[in-house]
């Protein structure tokens, strides 16, 4: 990872910026006087494309990013007027560190699930790295996630389209104890959520929470990691962050390299 792009910086005491879980890229942003970790992706301006299709006209309105850099264009997901908003889908990420099975919850985020399943079917996640591990455990900061879904492996990659945020799952999360107003949520261990670059900029990057994490309620929750998958996450987290690549030792490439060999529908 280079330091020329903007990056998600966690709110370590030494940092004057707030960490953001960025999808497609990373972006350090100031947040009043209290720096803290965040989750997101920052856009990278690029030459507009004239050959992109229009946005879909169904419930989710998947919208091509004409002015964004994307890594792998595989088209736009199906977008029915009435997508299924019940039940769950299983997806297994076959990684070099073990199988991580995730449960996608259509009741919480039907558009995120529709997009994720589409990308799985297209082989979008195959042979991609999980490029980022965060390990902020010092109070009052908390951000413990593995971030994946970028074919570039840099934090910049995306599928070439955006879709809107869905907050039903976020609203169901418990408030962080010090924030009873809900301005910070406890993205609890096992949560599966979308990274983003700001409101309504979901793409392909996602994060898996291996320990309770304090974040703004800005990241679409669309599922959970199964118990066997959590064991794999714990192994990755225990190895820590690869030293020497980033500004903070709590945030960077995982020391134990993680590569999604294949992503497929169904359980183990």
Regions flagged by a language model, labelled:
Residues 2-11, 18-268:
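Cyclophilin-like peptidyl-prolyl cis-trans isomerases
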């Amino acid at each position: 990872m280079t330091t020329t792009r903007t990056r998600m910086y966690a709110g370590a005491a030494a940092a004057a910026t707030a960490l953001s879980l960025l999808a497609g890229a990373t972006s350090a942003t100031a947040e009043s006087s209290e720096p803290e970790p965040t989750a997101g992706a920052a856009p990278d301006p690029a030459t507009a494309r004239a050959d992109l299709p229009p946005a879909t006209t169904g419930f989710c309105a998947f919208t091509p990013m004409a002015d964004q850099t994307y890594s792998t264009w595989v088209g736009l997901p199906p977008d029915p007027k009435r997508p299924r908003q019940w039940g769950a889908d299983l997806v297994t990420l076959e990684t070099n560190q073990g199988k991580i099975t995730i449960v996608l919850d259509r009741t919480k985020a039907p558009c995120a699930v529709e997009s994720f399943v589409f990308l799985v079917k297209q082989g979008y996640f195959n042979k991609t790295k999980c490029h980022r591990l965060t390990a902020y455990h010092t109070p009052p900061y908390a951000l413990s996630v593995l971030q994946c879904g970028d074919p570039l492996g840099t934090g910049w990659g995306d599928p070439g389209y955006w879709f809107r945020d869905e907050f039903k799952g976020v609203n169901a999360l418990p408030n962080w104890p010090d924030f009873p107003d809900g301005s910070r949520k406890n993205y609890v261990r096992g949560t599966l959520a979308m990274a983003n670059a700001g409101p309504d900029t979901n793409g392909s990057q996602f994060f898996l929470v291996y320990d309770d994490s304090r974040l703004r309620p800005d990241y679409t929750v669309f599922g959970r990691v199964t118990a066997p998958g959590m064991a794999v996450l714990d192994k990755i987290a225990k190895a820590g962050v690869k030293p020497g690549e980033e500004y903070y030792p709590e945030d960077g490439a995982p020391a134990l390299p993680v590569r999604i060999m294949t992503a497929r529908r169904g359980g183990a």
